[in-house]
Curated annotation (Swiss-Prot):
Belongs to the HAD-like hydrolase superfamily. MasA/MtnC family. The gene is mtnC. It catalyses: 5-methylsulfanyl-2,3-dioxopentyl phosphate + H2O = 1,2-dihydroxy-5-(methylsulfanyl)pent-1-en-3-one + phosphate. Monomer. Keywords: Amino-acid biosynthesis, Hydrolase, Magnesium, Metal-binding, Methionine biosynthesis. This is Enolase-phosphatase E1. InterPro entries: Enolase-ppase_E1 (IPR023943), HAD-like_sf (IPR036412), HAD-SF_hydro_IA (IPR006439), HAD_sf (IPR023214).
Length: 227
């Protein structure tokens, strides 16, 4: 019996194009001005220190770390301080209504139905928890945050490592076999299955893929009670 659903965001609840074509360019274009304008903010200072450590050069000056952050965006690196800084920049964008968080209609519909059925819903994304909350809190369908019981990011572990899913199961105090993980990435699903989870692959573009995971084109294809 599935008691909790853990979902990815990019390519799963939300379109890849929203992240790649809206969020990433928005943060990239504003990274330098944001860092310079908030250089005395304690939170930003701590994140810059973490970014310098991740770059292997704690003595790096701010201009060089800005250049490194922009390069990491271009390389789509999943580096925790970068993701946190992106989240702070996106917060300004959501607040200014420069964009809304994209969530597929079928995902909204099924998430609401599962919530009403008493299934606990959680998010696991490489984006920071702050960024996750912003996306689901500012959608065209309204604030979806009340649907979710918790959020996880790379601080719990890498998404392609079984240990991350084991850690999440411990946090939820549930047997892994009672958790369903949703993603569009085979390696993430493999890691979750190795940890004992049930899995389902979203294939929103390009048709069915060769996979040993159950799959479907949208959330309406997911039947937790049958997995």
């Amino acid at each position: 019996m599935i008691r909790a659903i853990l979902t990815d965001i990019e390519g799963t609840t939300s379109s890849l194009s929203f992240v790649k074509e809206t969020l990433f360019p928005y943060a990239r274009a504003r990274m330098a001005d944001f860092v310079r304008g908030h250089a005395r903010d304690a939170t930003v200072q701590a994140l810059l220190a973490d970014a310098k450590a991740a770059a292997g050069d704690p003595s790096m000056d701010d201009e060089h770390v800005i250049a490194r952050l922009v390069r990491w965006i271009d390389e789509d690196r999943k580096i925790t301080p970068l993701k946190a800084l992106q989240g702070l920049i996106w917060e300004e964008g959501y607040r200014n209504r420069d964009f809304f968080g994209h969530v597929y209609d079928d995902a909204v519909r099924r998430l609401k139905a599962w919530h009403e059925q008493g299934i606990s819903l959680y998010v696991f994304s490489s984006g920071s928890v702050h960024a996750q909350r912003l996306l689901f809190g500012h959608t065209a369908a309204g604030d979806l945050q009340p649907l979710f019981s918790g959020y996880f990011d790379t601080r719990i572990g890498a998404k392609q490592e079984p240990a991350a899913y084991s850690a999440i199961a411990r946090e939820l105090n549930l047997p892994p076999s009672e958790i369903l993980f949703l993603s569009d990435i085979e390696a993430e699903l493999d890691a979750a299955r190795e940890a004992g989870y049930k899995t389902f692959m979203l294939v929103r573009e390009g048709g069915a893929k060769a996979s040993h995971h159950p799959q479907g084109a949208d959330f309406d294809a997911i039947r937790p009670e049958l997995l």
